[in-house]
A protein has these predicted regions:
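Short, solvent-exposed mixed-charge patches
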Residues: 1, 302-303
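Catalytic centers of nucleases
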Residues: 1-86
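Short, flexible coil/linker elements and helix-boundary hinge sites characteristic
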Residues: 18, 107, 119, 279, ...
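Catalytic cores of nucleic-acid endonucleases
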Residues: 22, 58-266, 270
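Active-site beta-strand-loop-beta-strand hairpin of nuclease catalytic cores
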Residues: 42, 49-67, 71-72, 250-252, ...
C-alpha cells in the first residue's frame, strides 16, 4: 500500500551514499533492498530494508521502513481470511460478524443498482458485496471502530504468517525482514536527501502508541456494467449479495454471517445467471436502463 514512486526515489537516494547520520550516530550501509514474499501472493510490511553497521561499535543493525504518504488512510486492504486470522486470532470470523451487526442497517439502505451517477460511483454500477479493509481513522457509514488491540499486528506485522514476516532479500530469506521497525510519513516531493529520510523516521513502537485506533471499513465491490468489469475478480468479501429472481424481478439476500468466505467473481457469475433468467444478457449490449421495471421493490436503487 505504499507509493511505489516514493519507494524508488528513496532507494535511489540511498544508493548514492555509503554513510549517514541518525540519532547522533554514524552508520555505513551494507545492504539496501525491498523484501518480497516467497512464492508471491502479497507483500511484506517493509518497503525499504537497510542493513547497516553502527560505526561507533561496529555492530550490524537493521532499519526496516514502512513508507506512507501523509494523506494515507488505509492500513490493511485486500484482506483475506488468513490475514484476518493473523490479526484477530482464531475468533476472527466471529469478531468481523460482530462488527457487521453493529452497522447491519446501514448495509440495508445502500443503493445496489445505480441508474445514475452518485458521487464517485458511476452510472451502471451494480453492487456484488463489500470488501473488508482497515483504516487508521475513518467516519464512513460502513465503518466500525475496532475494539480489539491490533495495532502491533497491523503496523509491525506481529503474528503474520512466516512468509510475510521473513521476507526474501536479494534472494535470501531474512528472518523478520518483513516486520518494519520504522515508519516514514512524508510527501514524496520533500524527499531529496538522506537527511529527509532518516531525520523523519518514527519508531513503530512510538507509532503504535499514537495510531492505535483502527476502523474496520466495508467498501463496495461494484460491477461497472458500462466497462464490463469489476476491480478484481478475486477480492474476498466481508458481506456479499446472493442475487436471485423473485416474482420475475431481480432481488437479493444479504449474507452477513460468512465474512471472507466468498470471492467477487462467483458473485458476478451469480448476477449474470439471474439476469439471463429474465431475458437480460449482462455481457452483450447491456444497458443499465434495461433493468428499469425489472428490479424487485426490496432492492434499494439510485435514480
Amino acid at each position: 500500500m505504499a507509493d511505489d514512486g516514493a519507494e524508488i526515489k528513496i532507494r535511489n537516494i540511498l544508493k548514492k551514499i555509503k554513510t549517514f547520520q541518525m540519532n547522533s550516530s554514524k552508520y555505513e550501509i551494507i545492504r539496501l533492498s525491498k523484501p518480497t514474499v516467497l512464492g508471491g501472493g502479497g507483500e511484506t510490511k517493509t518497503d525499504i530494508y537497510i542493513k547497516v553497521k553502527n560505526k561507533s561499535n561496529n555492530k550490524e543493525e537493521e532499519i526496516k521502513i514502512s513508507y506512507k504518504k501523509p494523506s494515507f488512510s488505509f492500513v490493511e486492504n485486500k484482506i483475506k481470511s488468513n490475514r484476518a486470522k493473523a490479526i484477530y486470532g482464531n475468533n476472527w470470523s466471529k469478531i468481523i460478524q460482530e462488527q457487521i451487526n453493529e452497522i447491519r442497517d446501514n448495509f440495508l439502505v445502500k443503493p445496489l443498482v445505480y441508474f445514475e451517477k452518485s458521487g464517485r460511483i458511476e452510472k451502471g454500477s451494480i453492487t456484488l458485496g463489500w470488501r473488508y479493509e482497515m483504516e487508521h481513522s475513518g467516519s464512513r457509514s460502513l465503518g466500525v471502530k475496532i475494539k480489539q488491540d491490533i495495532a502491533a499486528q497491523v503496523w509491525e506485522n506481529k503474528g503474520a504468517q512466516a512468509q510475510y514476516k521473513d521476507g526474501i532479500v536479494d534472494g535470501n530469506e531474512i528472518p523478520l525482514s518483513g516486520m518494519p521497525n520504522f515508519c516514514l510519513t512524508i510527501d514524496p516531493e520533500k524527499i531529496n536527501t538522506s537527511e529527509d529520510i532518516f531525520g523523519n523516521l518514527v519508531s513503530m513502537k512510538k507509532l503504535i502508541l499514537t495510531h492505535g485506533d483502527i476502523t474496520a471499513a466495508f467498501l463496495a465491490q461494484n460491477y461497472r456494467s458500462h466497462k464490463q468489469k469489476q476491480e478484481g475478480n478475486r477480492r474476498h468479501l466481508g458481506v456479499w449479495l446472493d442475487w436471485k429472481i423473485l416474482d420475475g424481478k431481480l432481488a437479493c439476500e444479504y449474507v452477513f454471517d460468512k465474512p471472507l468466505e466468498m470471492e467477487s467473481l462467483p458473485r458476478l457469475e451469480n448476477l449474470d445467471r439471474c439476469l439471463k433468467q429474465i431475458g437480460i444478457d449482462l455481457k452483450n449490449n447491456f444497458k443499465i436502463d434495461l433493468l428499469k421495471d425489472k428490479i424487485h421493490e426490496s432492492v434499494p436503487v439510485y435514480t
